[in-house]
Structures are given as C-alpha cells and as structure tokens.
Amino acid sequence: MSGRITTLCTVLGVAIATVGLYLPYRNELNDYLYQKEFLTGKWSTDAEYVINSGDLGLDISQPIVTVQLIVDKDGSINGEIISETLCDDMPLTWNITMNSDSPSLKNFVFARTFEVRQLINGAMDKSPVVATLKLTEEDQKHNAITFEVVSDATGRLPKKLIFGKDLPKFDENYKFLQDYCAKSTAKFYEEVMPKIKKLRDNPKS
C-alpha cells in the first residue's frame, strides 16, 4: 500500500510540476503549437514562376492542389482542399474540407493530423472521413509545409504533398479547379439523373 501511495504522490508531483512549468509560458507554448500566422493562408502545389522552387521542395511532379487554412483562437484549423481527382471522386459537391482539432502538448512530439471530409446532406461534421493527412514539416523560412497521406479512401492522392504559401499562380489554379469541379459535378448529374428517372418510372425493371 505504501508503495502505491508513493507512486501516486510521485505522479501527482510530476503533474503539478508540469502544470507549474506550463502556466507561465502557456502563451509562448500555444503560439508554437498553433502557428496561427504561419498556417493561416493560401497554400498550393504549383510553383511556376517561383525561381527558388527547389528551396521550397516544390521542384517535383505534383498534381495541382490548393488549400486554404484558417487557424481559430483555440488552435483548431478549418480549411478547404480542392484538386481534380478529389472532385472526380466526390462529384456530389466540391465543398471539401480539411480540418484539424486543437493541438495539445502531445503535438510537441507527434505530428498534427488533418481530416478531409465532403459536405453531405447539409452536414460536414457527421460526414465520413475521405482522407487523413499528417503535417510532417513546417518550413517557415521558405513558407512551405509538407503533408504525409496517412489514409485515402479515393486511392488517388500521392503519398506526400508539399505546399507553398501565397504562390504566384494560386488564384489562377483555384479558379481552374473551381471550374473543373463544377463541370465534374454537372457531368455526374447528367449521367446519373437519367438512370434515376428510369428507375422511378420502371421500379420493377
């Protein structure tokens, strides 16, 4: 019994000491964890017109993908991700989010994860997770971030995606993808609606 009490006191002592160290520096620690100013913004993979693309890690072949992120007060991240393959695989709507929960002290050691979801029936939080990405690198010197794709229900995302911030072609890429996704959705409904109508008109066929 005395051994358990000693262990419990030790654990409590460590916890109290940890909290005592955390509280005086919580603002600095939260700034480090949240990376609000750095992560908030427009990110993309197309490094055309960027003369030092190699410094960003963008001198590799990647699909055109755009991401927009907003870091909330609690450090959670709300974002949007869009690409041709994502729109083709999820043609019902191209409202595709990329969100991350508020980080905790464990994220000093473990990378943050982001969940990709699609708006279905007017609900995003209850929709299935399409893909999970892990933020493995933050290069603040060159304004670049790297994600590792942990899971991907579409099977078409590359294993790794590298994004640069505020790249010259972001707006052009974003407009192209918006137009592409609108056409992808229209094509889907053009192909599906006649089949649905046929089933309604001939339920026994």
Walk through the language-model features, giving the residues of each.
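Central antiparallel beta-sheet cores of small beta-barrel/beta-sandwich binding domains
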Residues: 30, 34-138, 148-153, 165-166, ...
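A short pocket-lining beta-strand/turn micro-motif at the edge of beta-sheets
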Residues: 141-145
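Hydrophobic, helix-forming membrane-interacting segments
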Residues: 1-31
